[in-house]
């Protein structure tokens, strides 16, 4: 029984997500009255009525005490509530079936906030404008928007329960150097260069292209002018792709089962793709004429031989951190194209429009006014000494230039009003007046951002790559990977197997190795679905081990939050262990430090909530400014017959082996 709600301080619903059980509980609470013809209130109204006391009491406490509650459980512990205020929007997560704890609910809220940022960019910093985006006046648009984010939350919950990469929040690569090299060359030549040399691209610049097989990254290529993409942003893009084309739709052969023991750890190289005269079903689809005697067979079996490929989705506007003109800029507008090659295999292209530099200017100005607001809130003295602040002089120059170039009447008059109050020697404005003017300028800058990047988004009729150019890229990549298609789909389910580790590491049942500097992980396959299985099979043993691994991930996070970087304990017939450590670029282990202890209501540990590991690396690097520092994690499951000293020794050897393997550049 689950629910997520985003509301204003007045209990106006901006977004909600519920499962069937929660909806049923609402129907029981707001059951039919004596007049059976009287309709039940809309679900949105039911939620507003149910949670209004919680919202109002929380906001009142915040106003009166400058503090409020962030978590509580109802009588008898039936339901758990977690609340977090982001800007002017209150996020609430509820669980009533004891399947999620406080950390899980808080993580869900932070992921939802991150998804809002990816979709709306810097508009999320302004309470009034984000309300307009999340609650459009048109009911049809509102339903469509809410259904989109509801679907994303369902997809996130499914991936977190099924995929190791989402459980630990790290990227999982398909390990096959030869194929990866082939794909990188194809992405460079047939995607990035093909788009950027086309005269019909309309100013759009192709920056990044990557291939996904289910939720695993096969290859990634960036143009020379592109800045690096954060692992967290790449992981959320995988989430978006999985929402568009869920992996369970992949056509799999139910009659033929394979297990990991039947798949040796060897690479194979199929023959080059056939030319235009190739025989087989592909040429028939492209308009060739099959032999007459084969025509009926082809018609009957076409769907079996060639699974239906999903249609490409419409281009969509997304916002990702990037460098613009060698300056870091948060939430730069990009256009995302998801081009499915086959069910389960997708090509993703990211482009940037010529107006991207405007995002940098607006971001710098809004950041400057935010810092100015912070200074003004320190007291009246801060307002009096405003002109002497170096920050203000730089901000004034930037804003004068922007207003002159933009020429918008509204922001021009607001800026003149602000300057009259801030820099007047005879009648300087008070801190409260300056704060009010500051907020007004920020809102107008945010409105310009919204006008340029949201109202002109590709899905709202804005500019994007022509369809035939997208089709060309999709066709060329299909041709390149035709012979590898079946291998890739199997490889994605059997990426790494435990067989190759059992001889050197007896007693090892499972492991997850994460390079937190690059945000990438390595782990043996752990599938226990009806159609796919790992070495442990499909029975209760596979599900049992998976439950152990997921439980270890949660426990390791809780202990890391309390400052522990090593964990070793016995649970039944298993030893569970967790290690976090730092190394330099040469692979030498660095001296361990005491990591910060975090409160229970702090940002969740991971990449999607607030990129905890990037902050941890910065914290560690303070005392080593001249040395590149890397952070690693290892989670392992051993049989309890293994002595603990041997287990620790194995963990070190396993980490060394995986470190050496990860040196192969695949991106």
From Swiss-Prot:
Keyword Ubl conjugation: no
Repeat region ([DE]-X(4)-L-L), residues: 45-51, 147-153, 483-489, 611-617
Sequence motif Melanosome targeting signal, residues: 665-667
Any one of the GO BP annotations: vesicle-mediated transport
UniProt GO MF annotations: guanyl-nucleotide exchange factor activity
Subunit structure: Component of the biogenesis of lysosome-related organelles complex-3 (or BLOC-3), a heterodimer of HPS1 and HPS4. HPS1 cannot but BLOC-3 complex (heterodimer of HPS1 and HPS4) can interact with the GTP-bound form of RAB9A and RAB9B. HPS1 and BLOC-3 complex do not interact with the GDP-bound form of RAB9A and RAB9B.
Annotated keywords: Guanine-nucleotide releasing factor, Repeat
Protein's recorded name: BLOC-3 complex member HPS1
GO cellular-component term (any): BLOC-3 complex
Task performed by this protein: Component of the BLOC-3 complex, a complex that acts as a guanine exchange factor (GEF) for RAB32 and RAB38, promotes the exchange of GDP to GTP, converting them from an inactive GDP-bound form into an active GTP-bound form. The BLOC-3 complex plays an important role in the control of melanin production and melanosome biogenesis and promotes the membrane localization of RAB32 and RAB38.
């Amino acid at each position: 029984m689950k629910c997520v709600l985003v509301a204003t301080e007045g209990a106006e619903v901006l977004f909600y997500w519920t499962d069937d059980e929660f909806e049923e509980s609402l129907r029981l609470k707001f059951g039919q009255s004596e007049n059976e013809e009287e309709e039940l209130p809309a679900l949105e109204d039911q939620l507003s009525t149910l949670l209004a006391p919680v919202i109002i009491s929380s906001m009142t406490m915040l106003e009166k005490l400058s503090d409020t509650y962030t978590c509580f459980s109802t009588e008898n512990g039936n339901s758990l509530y977690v609340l977090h205020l982001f800007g002017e929007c209150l996020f609430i997560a509820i669980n009533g079936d004891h399947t999620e704890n406080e950390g899980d609910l808080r993580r869900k809220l932070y992921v939802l906030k991150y998804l809002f940022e990816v979709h709306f960019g810097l508009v999320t910093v302004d309470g009034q404008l984000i309300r307009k985006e999340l609650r459009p006046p048109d009911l049809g648009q509102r339903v469509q928007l809410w259904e989109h984010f509801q679907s994303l939350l369902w997809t996130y919950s499914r991936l977190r329960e099924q995929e190791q990469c989402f459980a630990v929040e790290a990227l999982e690569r398909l390990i096959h150097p030869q194929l990866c090299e082939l794909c990188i060359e194809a992405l460079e030549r047939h995607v990035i260069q093909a788009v950027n040399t086309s005269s019909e691209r309309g100013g759009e610049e192709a920056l990044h292209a990557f291939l996904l097989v289910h939720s695993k990254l096969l290859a990634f290529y960036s143009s020379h002018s592109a800045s690096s993409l954060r692992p967290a942003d790449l992981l959320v893009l995988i989430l978006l792709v999985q929402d568009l084309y869920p992996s369970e739709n992949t056509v799999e052969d139910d009659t033929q089962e394979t297990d990991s023991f039947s798949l040796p750890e060897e690479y194979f190289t199929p023959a080059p793709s056939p030319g235009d005269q190739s025989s087989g079903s592909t040429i028939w689809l492209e308009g060739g004429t099959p032999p007459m005697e084969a025509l009926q067979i082809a018609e009957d079996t076409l769907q079996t031989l060639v699974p239906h490929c999903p249609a490409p989705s419409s281009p969509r506007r997304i916002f990702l951190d990037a460098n613009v003109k060698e300056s870091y800029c948060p939430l730069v507008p990009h256009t995302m194209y998801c081009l499915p090659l086959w069910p389960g295999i997708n090509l993703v292209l990211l482009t940037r429009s010529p107006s991207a530099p405007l995002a940098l200017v607006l971001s710098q100005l809004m950041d400057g006014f935010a810092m100015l607001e912070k200074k003004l809130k320190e007291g009246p003295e801060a307002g009096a000494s405003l002109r002497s602040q170096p920050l203000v002089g730089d901000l004034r120059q930037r804003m004068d230039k922007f207003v002159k170039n933009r020429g918008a009447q509204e922001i021009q008059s607001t800026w003149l009003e602000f300057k009259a109050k801030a820099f007047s020697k005879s009648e300087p404005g008070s801190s409260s007046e300056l704060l009010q003017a500051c907020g007004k300028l920020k809102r107008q800058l945010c409105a310009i951002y919204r006008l340029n990047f949201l109202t002109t988004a590709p899905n709202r009729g804005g500019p994007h790559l022509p369809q035939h150019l997208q089709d060309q890229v999709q066709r060329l990549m299909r041709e390149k990977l035709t012979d590898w298609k079946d291998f890739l789909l199997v490889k994605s389910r059997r990426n790494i197997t435990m067989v190759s580790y059992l001889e050197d590491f007896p007693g090892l049942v499972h492991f997850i190795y994460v390079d937190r500097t690059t945000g990438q992980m390595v782990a043996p396959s752990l599938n226990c679905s009806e159609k796919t299985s790992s070495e442990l099979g499909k029975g209760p043993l596979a599900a049992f081990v998976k439950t152990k691994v997921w439980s270890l991930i949660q426990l390791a996070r809780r202990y890391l939050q309390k400052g522990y970087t090593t964990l070793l304990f016995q649970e039944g017939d298993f030893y569970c262990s967790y290690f976090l450590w730092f190394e330099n670029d040469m692979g030498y282990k660095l001296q361990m430090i005491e990591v910060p202890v975090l409160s229970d209501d702090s940002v969740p540990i991971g990449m999607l909530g607030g990129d905890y590991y990037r902050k941890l690396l910065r914290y560690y690097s303070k005392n080593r400014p001249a040395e590149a520092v890397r952070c690693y994690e290892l989670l392992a499951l051993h049989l309890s017959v293994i002595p603990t000293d041997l287990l620790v020794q194995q963990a070190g050897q396993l980490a060394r082996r995986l470190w050496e393997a990860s040196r192969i550049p695949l991106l």
